[in-house]
């Protein structure tokens, strides 16, 4: 009806046993078809200084393949990733070396890590790969103690934050221009 592309994720997908799932992200085309899907590789197993312990691997299995890059007709080449992956720059270099001009990073960053790391990591991934970063982000309080950072963002290939949804529910919307990616990659040929 609306003829839009939609990113779903991360969401749980059965992993074939009774106790684990995969954390999946999928890009859907205008007609609802799945254009690409990715199961998160890097799991969030950390003990944070705020006293919260996270062991994602207790319920989630790591994906076995690097994320895809899909050429979306009428838009650009899009690479997928999920949340904690953002801390592993080699994954994003893989995406850019496979042509990604826009990188999706849906996330549920904790408020504790997000306040110091979220925006900086997103800007670093945009700059070092001269690609747009679109980062949908969960916000709010969950399960009593867990608080998500929020701040869904769109960042351009120069590292400029084009849109930030803040901590409230909402949307981060900004135009993405393939020609800007091309121009910055010519001016700053760090991918060669």
Regions found by a protein language model. Give the residues of each.
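Short, highly charged low-complexity linear segments
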Residues: 137, 191-192
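Active-site catalytic loop in hydrolytic enzyme cores
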Residues: 14-98, 111-113, 120, 183-190
């Amino acid at each position: 009806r609306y003829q839009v592309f939609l990113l779903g994720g991360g969401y749980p997908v059965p992993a074939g046993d009774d106790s684990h799932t995969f954390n999946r992200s999928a890009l859907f085309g205008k007609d609802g078809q799945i254009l690409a899907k990715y199961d998160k590789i890097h799991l969030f197993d950390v003990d944070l200084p705020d006293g919260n312990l996270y062991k994602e691997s207790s319920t989630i299995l790591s994906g076995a393949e690097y994320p895809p890059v899909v050429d979306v007709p009428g838009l650009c080449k899009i690479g997928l990733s999920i949340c904690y992956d953002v801390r592993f720059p080699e994954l994003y270099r893989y995406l850019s070396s496979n042509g990604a001009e826009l990188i999706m990073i849906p996330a549920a960053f904790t408020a504790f890590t997000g306040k110091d790391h979220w925006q900086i990591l997103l800007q670093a991934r945009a700059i070092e790969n001269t690609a747009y970063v679109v980062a949908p982000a969960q916000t709010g309080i969950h399960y009593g103690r867990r608080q998500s950072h929020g701040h869904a963002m769109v960042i351009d290939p120069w590292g400029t934050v084009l849109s930030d949804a803040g901590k409230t529910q909402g949307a981060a919307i900004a135009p993405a221009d393939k020609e800007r990616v091309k121009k910055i990659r010519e001016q700053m040929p760090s991918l060669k």
